[in-house]
């Protein structure tokens, strides 16, 4: 006769510790797309800036602490039991989700530029923790290579940088403008160096002309290797490069001028205006890159002129936006 008492359900079997870490890494990576497109949490409460940043910093400290704890227990033998590993993984997952939840508390009206910076920091922390899980799941746990990866893991760097994030949209805008100035400065210096050396591909190709016969050079052309006209500027090319350099130099000066206008006249409550200035200024660096790349041989003069006109248009929009903000400040 069958027993009237049903057998107790068997406890679910936990995966091995390293497999649990790999699974957690996958779960964390699934959070990344949601953070990229996630909107700010709707609330009727007035935004408290000091409380938000305090909570965000505290959440970052918690994430860093959980990362350190997990690294300590998985960098030595014996490994934790499956039950202990489950607990560690749950704590890490909870710390990451708590950090993301705090990020969602930053409303849009505090500035799109500021939200982008905080979102970027959030993505760095989540991705850094996922990387850490993947590294810890590699065996043997005490290999020198593994320890090097762990010691330089980005999750701690991202958490430590949290207090350096700008606290308002004006500070965020100034940071982004400074980065754009640096990008354009680097592009200008690279262009100037190539022009001064009259060798746009200096260091990229070995000069072995003395070892190649005429027949060998003909063979290279057939095989698709660049000929001299593909590697060096013609006289017409060099004449066109001069105004291009001047335009990139003007772009750098323009960004510096905009940064000064924002620093001296921008107000923290001019959120939309600051966002507009940053959005337009963000177009300058890619436009400079397009122009810089188009001057390398073999040069298409039409492409260079199109990219130059595009950059001029972007510069005009950026300056108009900055001067508009300055005018509003003067009229207030």
Swiss-Prot record:
<dbReference type="GO" id="GO:0005634">
    <property type="term" value="C:nucleus"/>
</dbReference>
<feature type="region of interest" description="Required for interaction with CCND1">
    <location>
        <begin position="2"/>
        <end position="208"/>
    </location>
</feature>
<dbReference type="InterPro" id="IPR026907">
    <property type="entry name" value="GCIP-like"/>
</dbReference>
<keyword id="KW-0963">Cytoplasm</keyword>
<comment type="similarity">
    <text>Belongs to the CCNDBP1 family.</text>
</comment>
<dbReference type="InterPro" id="IPR049318">
    <property type="entry name" value="GCIP_C"/>
</dbReference>
<comment type="subunit">
    <text>Interacts with CCND1 and GRAP2. May also interact with COPS5, RPLP0, SIRT6, SYF2 and TCF3.</text>
</comment>
<feature type="region of interest" description="Interaction with RPLP0">
    <location>
        <begin position="240"/>
        <end position="332"/>
    </location>
</feature>
<dbReference type="Pfam" id="PF20936">
    <property type="entry name" value="GCIP_C"/>
</dbReference>
<dbReference type="Pfam" id="PF13324">
    <property type="entry name" value="GCIP_N"/>
</dbReference>
<feature type="region of interest" description="Interaction with RPLP0">
    <location>
        <begin position="2"/>
        <end position="190"/>
    </location>
</feature>
<keyword id="KW-0539">Nucleus</keyword>
<feature type="modified residue" description="N-acetylalanine">
    <location>
        <position position="2"/>
    </location>
</feature>
<keyword id="KW-0007">Acetylation</keyword>
<protein>
    <recommendedName>
        <fullName>Cyclin-D1-binding protein 1</fullName>
    </recommendedName>
</protein>
<comment type="function">
    <text>May negatively regulate cell cycle progression. May act at least in part via inhibition of the cyclin-D1/CDK4 complex, thereby preventing phosphorylation of RB1 and blocking E2F-dependent transcription.</text>
</comment>
<feature type="region of interest" description="Interaction with TCF3">
    <location>
        <begin position="150"/>
        <end position="332"/>
    </location>
</feature>
<feature type="region of interest" description="Interaction with TCF3">
    <location>
        <begin position="2"/>
        <end position="184"/>
    </location>
</feature>
<keyword id="KW-0131">Cell cycle</keyword>
<keyword id="KW-0597">Phosphoprotein</keyword>
<dbReference type="InterPro" id="IPR049317">
    <property type="entry name" value="GCIP-like_N"/>
</dbReference>
<dbReference type="GO" id="GO:0005737">
    <property type="term" value="C:cytoplasm"/>
</dbReference>
């Amino acid at each position: 006769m069958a027993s009237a008492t049903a057998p107790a359900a068997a406890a679910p079997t936990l995966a091995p510790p390293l497999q649990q870490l790999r699974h957690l890494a996958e779960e964390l990576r699934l959070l990344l797309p949601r953070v990229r497109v996630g909107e700010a949490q709707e609330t009727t409460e007035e935004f408290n800036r000091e409380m938000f940043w305090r909570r965000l910093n505290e959440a970052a400290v918690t994430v860093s602490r959980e990362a350190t704890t997990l690294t300590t227990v998985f960098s030595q033998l014996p490994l934790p039991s499956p039950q202990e590993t489950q607990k560690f993984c749950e704590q890490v997952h909870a710390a990451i989700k708590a950090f993301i939840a705090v990020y969602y508390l930053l409303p849009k009206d505090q500035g799109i530029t500021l939200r982008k910076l905080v979102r970027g920091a959030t993505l760095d922390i989540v991705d850094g923790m996922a990387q850490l899980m993947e590294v810890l799941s590699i065996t043997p746990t005490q290999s020198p290579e593994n320890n090097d990866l762990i010691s330089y893991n980005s999750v701690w760097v991202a958490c430590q940088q949290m207090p350096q994030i700008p606290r308002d949209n004006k500070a965020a805008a100034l940071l982004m403008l400074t980065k754009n100035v640096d990008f354009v400065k680097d592009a200008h210096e690279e262009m100037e160096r190539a022009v001064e050396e009259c060798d746009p591909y200096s260091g990229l190709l070995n000069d072995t002309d003395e070892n190649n016969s005429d027949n060998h050079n003909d063979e290279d052309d057939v095989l698709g290797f660049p000929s001299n006209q593909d590697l060096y500027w013609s006289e017409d090319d060099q004449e066109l490069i001069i105004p291009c350099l001047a335009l990139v130099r003007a772009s750098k000066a323009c960004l510096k001028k905009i940064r000064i206008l924002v620093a001296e006249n921008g107000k923290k409550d001019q959120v939309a205006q600051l966002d507009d200035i940053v959005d337009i200024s963000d177009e300058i660096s890619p436009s400079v890159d397009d122009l810089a790349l188009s001057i390398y041989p073999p040069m298409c003069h039409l492409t260079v002129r199109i990219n130059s006109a595009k950059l001029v248009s972007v510069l005009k929009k950026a300056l108009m936006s900055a001067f508009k903000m300055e005018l509003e400040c003067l009229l207030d």
